Amino acid sequence: MATNGHFAAIGNGSSDKTAYEHGVQVIDENKEFNANLSKYLTLEDVTPAGFNYHLISVFGSQSTGKSTLLNHLFGTQFSVMSELERRQTTKGIWMSKNKNGGDSSMADNILVMDVEGTDGRERGEDQDFERKSALFALATSEVLIVNIWEHQVGLYQGANMGLLKTVFEVNMQLFLKDRATSHRSLLFFVIRDFVGNTPLQNLQRTLMEDMSRLWDSISKPAGLEHSSVHDYFDFQFYGLPHKSYQPEQFVAETKKLSLRFREGQKDPSLDARKGEFSDGGVFLPEYHRRIPADGFSHYAEGIWDQIVNNKDLDLPTQQELLAQFRCDEILREVMVAFDEAIVPFEDKQSQAARLGEPEILGGLGAAMRASRSKAFKSFETEASRYHKGVYQRKRAELESKIDTRLKALFQGQLDATHKSGITEFSEAVSGAVKAGQKKGTGYDFAEIVNEEVTKAVQKFKEVAHETAVEGAAWSDSQQQLALYEKELAEVSARLRREEMRRLASRVERWVQSRLGESVGLEFNALGSGRAGGGAPEEGEKPTEKKFWDRVWNVFVETVLDAERRFTDRASSFDASLEEVDVGLWRLRRKSWGVLRAKIDEEMVEGNLLLKLRENFEDKFRYDDAGVPRIWRPTDDIEGIYTRARESTLTLIPLLSRFRLAETSAPPPLDRWVGHTPSSATAADEEDLPPIGGVDEEEGKSLEEEMTILSESKRQELTVRFKKAADGVYVEAKRSAIGGMTQVPLYFYGILLALGWNEIVAVLRNPAYFFLLFVCLVAGYVTYQLNLWGPIMKMTEAASNQALVEGKKRLREFLESSDTGRQAIAMSTAGGAGRGEQVEMSRLNKQGKTTAEDEDGDL
């Protein structure tokens, strides 16, 4: 606390409102500026007022009642001089807000500065503070109240002519720095102790003559020599009665005077040069310094810093510096609110990017639009009152900062939509294809792809539209949409290629199954070389010569059928002709590989030897009609054997090379496979085995490709077959020789002589004869039905079963009696003794064991 009670002096950092109840000290007597001025303005609700505030300063000699005048006009509580002591009361510059603000006739937010009086004995000859305070008041205030007594009008010191000359000089100093703008101020002369003997108009004329004389006496820069005081100042005058002698009139007149502190408009019909002055509102728009209330404290501090350091005061520069400071401050405040809304989305997006899991952020677009609009609106509301150039520059900076971050979020949202859309598209297409396959019904792959592409593009557009910020150039998503559609097309093509690969695989498996069955039948037919077997029913010549023709025809027909299947199915994929050509080309190559693998499987040495033996046995053991041969000694076994063996041996050179009987040349595999399509890629060829005669880089000819058995294999196979055939021949010879054993004829004569009596007895006895007849008929029927073998086997099985059952019943009988159990026990004990293990020893030639021989050597 200082001179004024309940005024916050410099150094009082209290935030208690009672400390600022009556006002605040702006500058103390030591020329120190109060940094808490902004706190006072905030407590008085002046800070949010923008330009809706007014600043008044009062000048006058010390102890002339300046503070008293302000207290009556504005209801303030500035300290006044004690009647008992004639000494300085106001030190420095003090400020208070109008306390009569409830009167609607007065302007809002009137700030009053009580300036230290001049010509005081405390400062004496030191006029430095007087000049600095005048310059400060002129740079900040709209209205300068000059408080003088009536009897001082016409005097130089008493009428504050020295102070007014200082005001004119500092105003010219300010004007020189900003010639583009004419800073006008109002000098309001309040004539105290006005008794009316001298008319107010005469006092006005005297004061104006003094003003003109003072203006003419100051030095002016080039070009302003003939300027007038009216070019920079307006004047108003008012007389007040004596406070002590006419207290009631004084209060009434101050009340009336206070009503003039309101907004007004300049009356163009009045001419101050003719002594015509306004008696309306004192706050004209041209008086306002256009400093927003929230920046006034910083502006005033900058002005005072320039003044107290004796630097040339440059108001435009100070306004720009203030604008720079306040715009930066407002920008930071706006960005804090912006961060609260946007940082959570940035964190989510960056975390999703780190995890590699793109996430579409819900509500991002609304948050971006709301935060951007709120930030710009808040900045515009608070900062647009400052220097236009600085405001526009800082607004562009704010827009750049906000849009840079929002653009990153927008791009991240589109990227997440892009990546997740591609993944979902692939999964949706694959799922639809699998569902169609499980149902077993046909599905249109092209229709599935087109439908999913439409869904994916629609979702991308919806997310882009929801996230877009109207008016922001960076929120145009057409380029990203084009890239998205391009990648969708690439993924569609890749999925189509994969589906065609799967289709080709299914067709290849079908070809493999069909060829495995058809070619297997042809090889199985090699086991029968007679007519009616593997050969046609007509003709006697074996069909082995056209074996490869039949294999090739089956192969070509199967592949043609597969190609039709492939082409029909590929048409539903919306595949291009080039893709279909590549698929058919791959199918033919893969099919040849399947055929060759099947041939190699059938031509394995063991399988082929078995086929040759079966072919030989079929020709050797069966006649041309297919009837099995019963070898007799009179048969030409050697001739049949030779013909069958030689016929079978002709198969080995036939099977060793894939040749067509019609052309005696390999099949046209190179023409059948065709040239590599121009649209085929390296990926299309990497899994294809090389084919001799088709792939030049393979280095194998078509003849080599068609070679099934090498020369060494043929010779080895021939030798092994001949050995097998020889075994069959030896077996046939043994069978023929074994059939030569017969019963001698004389044996039947002996049998007849010795058994004649029995024969006669049987023939004479009807019962025996009938029984013999029945037995002969039964034997004949059994023979004709070829049932002797089964009957013998059944008899043997029945006898064995009867033996087992008899043993079982005997054991049960023995176990049921004590004697039997003892016999079984003795048998078991004896068997156990006889079952004792004895180690066997190896004997040498002399009949001795090895151990005995070694003992003998020792």
Curated annotation (Swiss-Prot):
One of its GO terms (cellular component) is endoplasmic reticulum membrane. Keywords: Coiled coil, Endoplasmic reticulum, GTP-binding, Hydrolase, Membrane, Nucleotide-binding, Transmembrane, Transmembrane helix. Its EC number is 3.6.5.-. InterPro entries: G_GB1_RHD3_dom (IPR030386), P-loop_NTPase (IPR027417), RHD3/Sey1 (IPR008803), Sey1/RHD3-like_3HB (IPR046758). It is an enzyme of class 3 (hydrolase). It is found in: Endoplasmic reticulum membrane. Residues 764-766 are lumenal. HAMAP family: Sey1. This is Protein sey1. It comes from Aspergillus niger (strain ATCC MYA-4892 / CBS 513.88 / FGSC A1513).
